[in-house]
Design a protein with these regions (language model features):
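Hydrophobic helical membrane-anchoring modules
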Residues: 1-3, 14, 21-22, 174-242
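Acceptor/aglycone-binding surface of glycosyltransferases and processive sugar-polymer synthases
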Residues: 64, 70-81, 98-179, 183, ...
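A conserved acidic beta->alpha catalytic loop
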Residues: 35-44, 94
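Short, well-formed alpha-helical segments that are part of the catalytic scaffolds
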Residues: 11-25, 41
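Short beta-strand-to-loop acidic/aromatic patch adjacent to the donor-nucleotide binding site
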Residues: 84-95
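Donor nucleotide-sugar binding loop of glycosyltransferases
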Residues: 12-15, 38, 68, 97
Length: 242
C-alpha cells in the first residue's frame, strides 16, 4: 500500500529539521511538507535535514497562511493525485515522533483497520510537558465525543493519525468545504470516520510539547480557536453541516 505522511509547517524554525532527521527508512514512501509563509531560514533548515534521510520529500509552499485545514487538504490533493493509498498526518513542531509511524500504519496494513488515531492515553502512550489547561480539556473532550458518536475515544485532539485514502474519496465525506480551512477539518474527518462505519482503533503514541513558555508550545489559541475544535462535533451531530 503506497503511503505518504503530510506535515503542515508554519514557522517551525529549529523544529522541522529535527522532525525530518528522525525519519527512518521504509516508514512511508513519501514525505509531503506543506509550508505556510515560507521564509529562507525554514527552507535552509529543510534542505539540510532532507540530505540526512532517504525518504523523498515533496514541498508545497503557500505565500500566505490560510489555515492548517487548508494546508492538510493540499497534502490530500497531492496524495490522491499521485495514487497514495495510506495517509499519515503529523505535526511539524516536534510534538509527534516519526519513529512511531508504524504504530499507526501497521493496523491498516496488517489488521484491516481503516482509520487509526494516535493516543497518548491508551496503554503504552506517553505525554510530556502538556500544559495544564490543555491537558484537562483533552481528557474531558473525548468523553463528549464518546457520548455523541457511540464510539469510545480517548484522545480526539491528537493530530497524529493514519487512514486509508479511500476515506477521502467517500462521496459522504466532503473535505473540500470552505468552512474546513482551519482546525475544523481534522474533527470533521474524525466524526465522519467514526459515524460512517469505518473500522477505527486507537494506538499508543507519544506527545511532547517542546516549550513551556506562554504561546510557545502550539499555534492554537484557546480563546480564539475553541469553536473550530468543538464546533464540528455539534454542527455535524445536529445536521447543521454535512
Amino acid at each position: 500500500m503506497k503511503s505518504i505522511v503530510i506535515i503542515p509547517v508554519f514557522r517551525e524554525i529549529g523544529r522541522i529539521g529535527r522532525v525530518l532527521s528522525r525519519f527512518e527508512d521504509s516508514q512511508v514512501d513519501q514525505i509531503c511538507l506543506v509550508i505556510d509563509d515560507p521564509i529562507p531560514i525554514i527552507r535552509q533548515e529543510i534542505e539540510e535535514a532532507r540530505k540526512t534521510i532517504k525518504t523523498p520529500v515533496t514541498i508545497i509552499e503557500n505565500p500566505v497562511r490560510k489555515g492548517i485545514g487548508h494546508a492538510i487538504r493540499q497534502g490530500y490533493s497531492y496524495a490522491l493525485s499521485n495514487g497514495y493509498e495510506l495517509v499519515v498526518v503529523m505535526a511539524g513542531n516536534g510534538k509527534d515522533d516519526p519513529r512511531e509511524i508504524p504504530r499507526l500504519t501497521t493496523p491498516i496494513l496488517k489488521q484491516g483497520f481503516d482509520y487509526v488515531q494516535g493516543s497518548r492515553y491508551v496503554r503504552g502512550g506517553r505525554h510530556d510537558k502538556n500544559p495544564f489547561i490543555r491537558s484537562a480539556f483533552v481528557r474531558m473532550f473525548p468523553v463528549v465525543w464518546t457520548a455523541l458518536t457511540g464510539v469510545r475515544c480517548s484522545d480526539v485532539t491528537n493530530g497524529f493519525r493514519a487512514y486509508k485514502a479511500s476515506l477521502l474519496k467517500d462521496p459522504r465525506v466532503n473535505i473540500w468545504q470552505d468552512w474546513l480551512d482551519r482546525y475544523q477539518l481534522e474533527y470533521y474527518l474524525h466524526y465522519k470516520a467514526l459515524t460512517l462505519g469505518y473500522r477505527f482503533v486507537e494506538r499508543p503514541v507519544s506527545k511532547t510539547y517542546p516549550f513551556r513558555n506562554k504561546g510557545g508550545y502550539s499555534h492554537i489559541s484557546p480563546m480564539r480557536d475553541w469553536w473550530q475544535i468543538v464546533g464540528p462535533l455539534f454542527l455535524l451531530k445536529m445536521g447543521a453541516k454535512d
